[in-house]
């Protein structure tokens, strides 16, 4: 059964406490990545209704630090489903609830694999993108997947047709 991308949306909110920060009072990157992994896993599970495991995390760049006492908002949504894997796009914002403003902190792509009861990969539902953003993310997901597979040594560069097309247009 195909499912809408919007059906997988997870919004997670956390308050940055002293134990979450480094000596500069900024949210530690590892703590944010932990929260992002949870949000992405929940989005993947909503999509496939099965246990999932993290297969990969794309490059994460931290644009703006999130300070102690600020709020972290994480949005996670499945962008595309393949045979047993799903790409999840995450957007992260910080919010100063006292000053009443939000700012973008970062975004990333995670890949999850659905598992059957024996722990083996199992097929997942296809995604139906509806909004323009969902369609763009869906269309570009195959290129990102091929790059991940090449970097992980699971695909030869000469077999990456979508990726090669970027350089031959």
Regions from the PLM with identified roles:
Residues 14-16, 47:
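Short, small-residue-rich loop/turn micro-motifs
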Residues 21-33, 166-169:
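A conserved, well-ordered hydrophobic junction motif at loop->secondary-structure transitions
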Residues 2-7, 27, 41-75, 79-80, ...:
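Hydrophobic beta-strand-centered segment that forms part of the acyl-chain substrate-binding groove
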Residues 32, 36, 40-44:
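Buried hydrophobic packing segments
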Residues 2, 16-17:
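Membrane engagement elements in two modes
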Residues 6-12, 67-68, 79-169:
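HotDog/MaoC-like acyl-thioester-processing domains
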Residues 17-18, 63:
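Residue-level recognition of the GNAT/N-acetyltransferase active site
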């Amino acid at each position: 059964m195909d499912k809408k991308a919007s059906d997988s949306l997870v919004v997670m909110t956390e308050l940055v406490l002293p134990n979450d920060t480094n000596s500069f009072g900024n949210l530690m990157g590892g703590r944010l990545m932990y929260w992002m992994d949870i949000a992405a896993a929940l989005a993947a599970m909503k999509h496939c209704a099965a246990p999932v495991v993290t297969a990969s995390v794309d490059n994460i760049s931290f644009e703006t630090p999130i300070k102690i006492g600020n709020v972290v908002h994480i949005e996670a949504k499945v962008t595309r489903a393949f045979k047993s894997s799903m790409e999840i796009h995450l957007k992260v914002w910080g919010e100063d609830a006292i000053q009443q403003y939000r700012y973008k902190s970062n975004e990333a792509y995670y890949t999850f694999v659905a598992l059957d009861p024996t722990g083996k990969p199992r097929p997942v539902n296809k995604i139906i993108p509806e909004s323009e953003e969902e369609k763009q993310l869906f269309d570009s997901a195959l290129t990102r997947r091929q790059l991940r597979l090449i970097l992980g040594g699971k695909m030869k560069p000469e077999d990456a047709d979508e990726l090669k097309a970027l350089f031959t247009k």
